[in-house]
């Protein structure tokens, strides 16, 4: 059962990101305007190099926009955001439990509270039995579970995810997609999720943002009408799913062709 939604609200207005100056300037993001509702699961798709990851890094505070405004409302939360990358980023010399609790340790959370929160996070992702394992003893899917637990244990208002399941095999990807949706529904957090997969965006997201080729702009924002929980096999048999997937594919195809034409000029 889902909880009352309470994650961060995000307002982005006229955001631009430019690398370099003068004739060498590279416009990565151009006039991005976007509202993300509290507790929304927002997916972003776009051609390679369109600025998806740059936008996520700016939201995370790991990079700074050149101009424009970002307003994140996360009142009552100790931690504004946490980020999960394609690589789990678990420290190889730490056991799983220590990896998951690292963010709590660096914030000076008392040891007793750390232990309780780490155990809860491990249980959430199904890693309780592997708490004393090292990352090299885990499968790729289990390492990503650890990364998700590490992100959730700090109780962030929003979760920023940059293609977290892209390197996994189809079976593990499907399992973790379902787990992520379950955890999201239980927690009420806001999720911003980057993917190259149209199917994944339609499987997970409330809305899908389609970005243009560089410079990255928002080309279209598409509502995903299918109720959660979603099953990819069932969705694939749906005519509405097929039409929506084709619509997004055509939007992306136009951008890929435009980018190729620019290169070949």
Give residue ranges: language-model regions:
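Hydrophobic anchor residue at the start of the ABC signature
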Residues: 148
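Conserved ABC ATPase "signature" region
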Residues: 105, 112-130, 182
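Catalytic Walker B motif of ABC-type/P-loop ATPase nucleotide-binding domains
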Residues: 159-162
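Helix-to-loop junction immediately C-terminal to a conserved catalytic motif
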Residues: 60
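Conserved ABC transporter NBD signature motif
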Residues: 68-78
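Conserved signature/switch motifs of ABC ATPase nucleotide-binding domains
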Residues: 133-136, 154
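The feature captures the beta-strand-to-loop junction immediately N-terminal to the Walker
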Residues: 45-47
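Short coil-to-helix segment of the ABC ATPase nucleotide-binding domain corresponding to the Q-loop/switch region
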Residues: 94-102
């Amino acid at each position: 059962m889902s909880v009352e939604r309470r994650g961060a609200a995000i307002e982005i207005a006229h955001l631009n990101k430019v690398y370099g100056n003068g004739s060498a300037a590279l416009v990565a993001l151009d006039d991005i305007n976007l509202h993300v509702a509290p507790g929304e699961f927002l997916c972003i798709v776009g051609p390679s190099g369109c600025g998806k990851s740059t936008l996520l890094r700016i939201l995370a505070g790991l990079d700074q926009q050149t101009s424009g405004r970002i307003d994140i409302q996360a009142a009552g939360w100790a931690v504004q955001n946490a980020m999960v990358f394609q690589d789990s980023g678990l420290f190889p010399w730490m056991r799983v439990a220590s990896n998951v609790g690292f963010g709590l340790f660096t914030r000076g959370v008392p040891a007793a509270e750390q232990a309780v929160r780490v155990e809860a996070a491990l249980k959430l992702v199904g890693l309780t039995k592997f708490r004393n394992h090292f990352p090299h003893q885990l499968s790729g899917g289990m390492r990503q579970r650890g990364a998700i637990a590490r992100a959730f244990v700090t109780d962030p208002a929003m979760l920023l995810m940059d293609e977290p399941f892209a390197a996994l095999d189809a079976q593990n990807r499907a399992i973790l997609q379902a787990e992520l949706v379950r955890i999201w529904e239980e927690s009420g957090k806001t999720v911003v999720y980057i993917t190259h997969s149209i199917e994944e965006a339609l499987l997970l997201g409330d809305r899908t943002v389609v970005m243009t080729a560089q410079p990255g702009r928002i080309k279209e924002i598409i509502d995903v009408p299918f109720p959660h929980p979603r099953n990819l096999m069932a969705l694939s048999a749906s005519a509405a799913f097929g039409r929506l997937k084709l619509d997004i594919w055509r939007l992306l195809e136009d951008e890929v062709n435009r980018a190729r034409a620019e290169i070949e000029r």
